[in-house]
């Protein structure tokens, strides 16, 4: 008998997720942007799913934006935040342990002239909050960290980061990549002062090909993927309703 032990990389979709996907594929296959009945039915499913994901984060439905995956959520958060805040500073604070979907963004921003400061891990894999206290200043426009590390399992005390940002009179937005910790370790973005938070379905027995980005309703970032204006202009492209339905089942 096979024993699958790689659930930190991905999980087997549960039966409810598979059934929800099949139903959306075979019955609710309309484009949620269409005005005819099939489109309206798909739109209703979309918004019901948005409410479900919002409830899991103790957020409002209008703070949840569906994306094709956690990587797109991270890219959208980082480039969107920097685009909106770049007139206020050129410094970004992160860690040396981030997922490639964050680290590669940082490398691109460095090439564009931004300063990126990376907190270094201690022997136990944790990043000292002192690193953030020393790095964050009035020129910092974004702090981006992983809530739970996907390789060493260290947990970032995200609830303390916003306090540090405020104590430094910094305009920085706080982005948390919670793809690994979502639905495993409780994390309420509002209670922790998180402005942007990325999650994904395939780590929690949902389908691959869908993620979500929480954006606090008082925060404005620039759209990253341009096109037809779906997801309130934040992530254009026809929504993948089967995957979204499986995510929110």
Spans of features found by a protein language model:
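Pyridoxal 5′-phosphate
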Residues: 1-249
């Amino acid at each position: 008998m096979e024993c699958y032990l790689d659930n930190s990389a991905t999980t087997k979709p549960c039966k409810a997720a598979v059934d929800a996907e099949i139903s959306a594929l075979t019955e609710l296959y309309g484009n949620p942007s269409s005005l005819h009945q099939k489109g309206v039915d798909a739109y209703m499913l979309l918004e019901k799913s948005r409410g479900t994901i919002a409830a899991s984060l103790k957020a409002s439905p209008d703070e949840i934006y569906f994306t094709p995956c956690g990587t797109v959520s991270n890219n959208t958060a980082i480039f969107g935040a920097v685009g909106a805040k770049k007139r206020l500073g050129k410094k970004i604070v992160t860690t040396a342990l981030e997922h490639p979907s964050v680290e590669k963004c940082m490398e691109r921003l460095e090439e564009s002239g931004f300063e990126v400061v990376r907190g270094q891990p201690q022997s136990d894999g944790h990043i000292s909050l002192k690193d953030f206290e020393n790095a964050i200043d009035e020129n910092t426009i974004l702090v981006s960290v992983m809530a739970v590390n996907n390789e060493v399992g260290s947990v970032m005390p995200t609830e303390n980061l916003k306090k540090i940002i405020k104590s430094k009179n910094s305009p920085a937005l706080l982005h948390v990549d919670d793809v690994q910790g979502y639905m495993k370790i409780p994390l309420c973005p509002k209670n922790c002062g998180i402005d942007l938070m990325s999650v994904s379905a395939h780590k929690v027995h949902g389908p691959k090909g869908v993620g979500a980005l929480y954006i606090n309703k008082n925060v404005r970032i620039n759209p990253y993927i341009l096109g037809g204006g779906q997801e309130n202009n934040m992530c254009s492209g026809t929504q993948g309703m089967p995957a979204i339905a499986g995510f929110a089942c």
